Amino acid sequence: MDDDYMMLDDDYGEEEDENYSEDDNYSEAEVDLQPVTSTKSTSQVIKKESLVAAQKEILVRVMELLSVKENQARTLLIYYQWNVEKLFSVFADQGKDRMFSCAGLTVFVPSLVTSKKTMKCDVCMEDDLPSNVMTRMECGHRFCNDCWIGHFTVKINEGESKRILCMAHECKAICDEDVVRKLVSPELADRYDRFLIESYVEDNNMVKWCPSKPHCGSAIRKIEDGHDVVEVGCSCGLQFCFSCLSESHSPCSCLMWKLWKKKCEDESETVNWITVNTKLCPKCSKPIQKRDGCNLMTCKCGQHFCWLCGQATGRDHTYTSIAGHSCGRYKDEKVRQLERAQRDLDRYTHYHYRYKAHIDSLKLEDKLRKSILEKAVSNSETKDQKVFKEYSWVTDAVNRLFISRRILSQSYPFAFYMFGEELFKDEMSEKEREIKKNLFEDQQQQLEGNVEKLSKILEEPFDEYDHEKVVEMMRHLTNLTAVVDNLCKEMYECIENELLGPIQFGNHNIAPYRSKGIEQATEFCAESSDCGSSGSS
């Protein structure tokens, strides 16, 4: 380990033996990572009751700048996925008429005055209908109210409220919202409005529902910060990746994490184990495991076969040979497949064990965190010492431990795919792969060693120490906390610049490293409202 990162005295520099438990039934650690709050958040949480206000804020902006009605503004925004900048760019480059046409809007054509008292509906083909039961859309097409109601009812019930087209053949015009509300029942109108409101989330690349289960009812709006992938924290406490909506997983890319979770959940490695440790009976094809040294295998179906080559044989044999049988030619392809299965199994086991070990540590350290915070608060109230009155050095160290432990756990799935052949087989030569692997593992090892030291020091009973020893512990913790933070930062820089940088990022963008942890979204509040921000510090 480099001298730059050995900044502790001997008492705090001893290595702790790793003793990770391996429980067959485990789940991800559900721990509070103390989400960061900021007055300049890169995300906002929009609660269910604020969705209308959030949508209205953008609608008003478009209505004022383009001089359009609310329903027209909403239709435009839905078509352009609520991307106001893109909408204004199309308006500037192509003009209003072209923009309207693409979105399914028409410039209103004044209705011609007619003296006819009765009219014909071209949908139901009814003649002699009174003009007052006929409704005309802005595109100019007119049909009877019963046909319109039937059309609207079907579309709303099918979930197509956001873009209900005119019934006329090949007409691409969107039906007026006010007309829809006027003709359908109040219950259906409420459902229609709910779909229009939810469109702000479901058709908006910058807003997504919180994936909490059960659903907390809130949505998260990402504020443009130059990063394609970000990790956010909802007010309900859930922290997740804004891009793929899974749990926070950096430094893994979304694709890496998806593949890793699937690999952990499915039976791919079980199949590898069976391939390595069993042979198929040549008669019934059931897998047989060898339990002793004899190469003559006997299946439950009664078939005898040779363990070495898998060929069917008779039962007469000695310890070293089978009567009337000699193994055939060297099965080169079969041996290669077996060796590959063994290699893949060993590799997966290596990375998964270390990934799981840090997850297990994270669970145990959650209990440690609670105990430490209780001690710090208790001492700040009972001891007249300045160091106890200001115990941010303890909470900072605990938060740093959790942030770095999570990063460490997910650095193993990253390494599994970064230096394997599944994703980047053709992106680098074997020599380049080995160089990059060594570079990453050196940084990973430095981070791992210092995180274990941090965990060990935090286990000390500082509430029993005298003032002088507490000050000494505070100095070491503060120093080590900064070291771990810097190592995390350097690991991310290595990944972004040295590992993924030379490769076209494509599907492998990662969320940026944030020294203070995943940022909690501030609460959206309409300008006219008097609410406060839950995420303000």
UniProtKB/Swiss-Prot annotation:
Chain ranges of zinc fingers (RING-type): 121-171, 281-309
Record field: catalytic activity: [E2 ubiquitin-conjugating enzyme]-S-ubiquitinyl-L-cysteine + [acceptor protein]-L-lysine = [E2 ubiquitin-conjugating enzyme]-L-cysteine + [acceptor protein]-N(6)-ubiquitinyl-L-lysine
Cofactor binding note of this UniProt entry: Binds 4 Zn(2+) ions per subunit.
Gene Ontology biological process terms from the UniProt entry: protein ubiquitination
Obligatory cofactor(s): Zn(2+)
UniProt keyword annotations, A-Z: Metal-binding, Repeat, Transferase, Ubl conjugation pathway, Zinc, Zinc-finger
Keyword Chloroplast: no
Residues that hold Zn(2+) 1 according to the record: C121, C124, C144, C147
A GO term for molecular function: zinc ion binding
Pathway, per record: Protein modification; protein ubiquitination
Protein residues bound to Zn(2+) 5: C281, C284, C299, C301
Expression (tissue specificity): Ubiquitous.
Residue numbers spanned by region Disordered: 1-30
Pfam families: Ariadne, IBR, IBR_1, UBA_ARI1
Domain of life: Eukaryota
Zinc finger (IBR-type) residue numbers: 190-254
List of residues binding Zn(2+) 4: C241, C244, H249, C254
Entry EC number(s): 2.3.2.31
CDD domains on file: BRcat_RBR_ANKIB1 (cd20346), Rcat_RBR_ARI1-like (cd22586), RING-HC_RBR_TRIAD1 (cd16773)
Binding site for Zn(2+) 6: C306, C309, H317, C327
Function recorded in the entry: Might act as an E3 ubiquitin-protein ligase, or as part of E3 complex, which accepts ubiquitin from specific E2 ubiquitin-conjugating enzymes and then transfers it to substrates.
Protein family: Belongs to the RBR family. Ariadne subfamily.
Protein name per the record: Probable E3 ubiquitin-protein ligase ARI3
Lineage, uppermost ranks: Eukaryota, Viridiplantae, Streptophyta, Embryophyta, Tracheophyta
Gene: ARI3
